[in-house]
Regions:
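Central regulatory/effector-binding core of bacterial HTH transcription factors
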Residues: 1-49
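Secondary-structure junction motif
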Residues: 2-6, 80, 84-108, 172-176
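Short beta->alpha connector loops
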Residues: 24-27, 46-48, 69-71, 94, ...
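Hydrophobic hinge/microswitch elements
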Residues: 25-30, 34-37, 43-44, 89-149
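Flexible hinge/capping segments at coil-to-helix
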Residues: 50-62, 66-88, 173
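Short beta-strand->loop
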Residues: 53-63, 68, 130-138, 142-158, ...
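A late-sequence structural motif
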Residues: 147-187
Length: 187
């Protein structure tokens, strides 16, 4: 979700550069920064040392999106265990958010829908529960036939940190000035 804001800003500020993204584990991104494969990374933990700098960028909170008629739809909050055993479609390219429910809901059946349109059709046609987040919902109208309910488990919340090599700070200054004056995002 942080890339939804970051990539367009980078593209606008660095028009003469190619902007590319990869979804990787934090340790792989840190290694890529250290070996100069990356100039900027979004991590879920702050990093210090090895010539790297990080600053909090924002946070994200996972939620269940349920059909309005679902037995749990009236609850103020839920835990992963409340829907353990359910069949739940997942959007593609959600990175670590795919692994957390798999670990916390071992009896559930998860299946990734490769196209967003297929995901939406499936969720609505079969009135299935799915995941959303405060960042995914930002700027979007709530669907009248669904409710979103926060997940209380600590694993359902994450902080994001921008990380970069200190030697790239001058190059990244326009981006850092623009994005960090507005941070943190989420909640």
């Amino acid at each position: 979700a942080p890339l939804w804001d970051i990539v367009p800003l980078l593209a606008a500020l660095y028009r003469d550069r190619t902007i590319s993204t990869e979804l990787r584990e934090d340790h792989e991104l840190i290694s890529g920064l250290a070996t100069e494969n990356y100039r900027l990374a979004v991590l879920t933990e702050p990093v210090r040392g090895h010539g790297l700098v990080s600053r909090k960028y924002g946070e994200e909170h996972l939620m269940f999106s349920l059909p309005a008629g679902h037995p749990l739809a009236g609850r103020k909050s839920l835990r992963f265990s409340d829907l353990n055993g359910a069949a739940i479609p997942l959007r593609p390219g959600i990175g670590f958010w795919e692994e957390i429910p798999r670990k916390k809901m071992p009896d559930s059946h998860f299946f990734v829908q490769e196209r967003s349109s297929s995901f939406e059709e499936l969720v609505h046609a079969y009135a299935m529960p799915c995941f959303s987040s405060d960042l995914a919902r930002r700027g979007r109208e709530l669907e009248p036939d669904r409710v979103t309910i926060p997940i209380d488990d600590p694993e359902a919340s994450v902080e994001y940190f921008l990380a970069w090599r200190r030697q790239d700070e001058d190059f990244l200054r326009p981006f850092l000035d623009a994005v960090l004056r507005e941070a943190p995002r989420g909640k």
